[in-house]
Regions:
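Cysteine endopeptidase catalytic domains of the caspase/legumain-like
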Residues: 1-240
Length: 240
C-alpha cells in the first residue's frame, strides 16, 4: 500500500447566518477534498462550521497531525484581519464593536494552526487561504481589508488567494469555483512540479482569470522540496 502523502484539514464556510453568504465556498471545499484524497492525503473536513465546531475540528486535526511528516490546511470562507492578526470567521459570528470582545468570543485565530506549524519545523507545513473575500459587513474601524501578511515559520509555506490587504474575487454561482481555487485545482495535479513553481502557475492563471485584479501571494520558508503529484514517466504515459 502506497504511503500517505500527508494529512489535510479542509474547512469550507459558505452559509453564514448574519454575514454575506459565499456560494462558491461549498464547491471549493468539496473539490479540494476530492483532489487531496486523489493525491493520497488523509483528509479531515468540515463545512458551515460554528465557532465551537471549528475549534473542535482544528483540535482533532492537530492531535492527529503529530503522526504525519506533511500537513496541509485549506480554508475557504470569510477571513478578517484585526490589529495585525488574521482570523477565520465561523458561520455563527455576531459582530461586536469591541475588538477585544469580538476577537475573543466570535472569531477563530489562524494562530491556533500556525503556532503548531512553527513548533514543528521538521514537517512540511502548508496553509492555503482562499479567505480574502470582501468585508463581511464589519466596521472598518475594527476590521481591515483582506488578510494581513503572515511570516511563514521554518518548514512552512502560507499561500493567500490575493496580496495582503486586498480582497479576492469569486462568482456568486454555487456551481463555480472561486478564481483562486479553480487555478489551484488545475495546477495541483500536475506531475513532478515543485510546490513553489506550482503556486507561480496558480498566480499566473488567477491574474488572467481576473484581468489583473487579483494577484495571489505566498510566503515560504520550506526547508525541503515538496511535490504534490510525483509520477514516473510510465505513469504519465498511461494518462496520455
Amino acid at each position: 500500500m502506497k504511503a500517505k502523502k500527508g494529512l489535510a484539514l479542509v474547512i469550507a464556510n459558505a452559509d453564514y447566518l448574519q454575514q454575506n453568504k459565499l456560494p462558491t465556498c461549498k464547491k471549493d471545499g468539496n473539490d479540494m477534498q476530492k483532489v487531496l484524497e486523489y493525491l493520497n492525503f488523509d483528509v479531515i473536513s468540515g463545512s458551515d462550521l460554528k465557532r465551537t465546531s471549528m475549534y473542535d475540528l482544528i483540535s482533532k486535526f492537530l492531535e492527529v497531525a503529530e503522526l504525519y511528516s506533511t500537513i496541509l490546511v485549506y480554508y475557504t470562507g470569510h477571513g478578517v484581519q484585526i490589529d495585525g492578526e488574521n482570523y477565520f470567521v465561523p458561520i455563527d459570528c455576531e459582530y461586536k464593536n469591541s475588538k477585544a470582545i469580538f476577537t475573543e468570543t466570535q472569531l477563530v485565530g489562524i494562530n491556533a494552526i500556525t503556532d503548531f506549524m512553527t513548533a514543528n519545523p521538521s514537517k512540511t507545513n502548508i496553509m492555503i487561504l482562499d479567505a480574502c473575500r470582501s468585508n463581511p459587513g464589519f466596521s472598518k474601524d475594527v476590521v481591515g481589508d483582506g488578510l494581513t501578511e503572515v511570516m511563514a515559520g521554518n518548514g512552512t509555506l502560507i499561500a493567500f488567494a490575493t496580496a495582503p490587504n486586498k480582497v479576492a474575487l469569486a462568482s456568486q454561482n454555487e456551481d463555480e469555483n472561486s478564481f483562486y481555487t479553480k487555478a489551484l485545482l488545475d495546477n495541483i495535479v500536475r506531475p513532478n512540479i515543485k510546490i513553489e513553481d506550482m503556486f507561480k502557475s496558480v498566480r499566473n492563471d488567477v491574474v488572467l482569470l481576473s484581468d489583473g485584479e487579483q494577484v495571489p501571494w505566498e510566503n515560504t520558508s520550506l526547508n525541503k522540496d515538496f511535490y504534490f503529484n510525483t509520477m514516473s514517466q510510465d505513469e504519465i504515459d498511461e494518462q496520455i
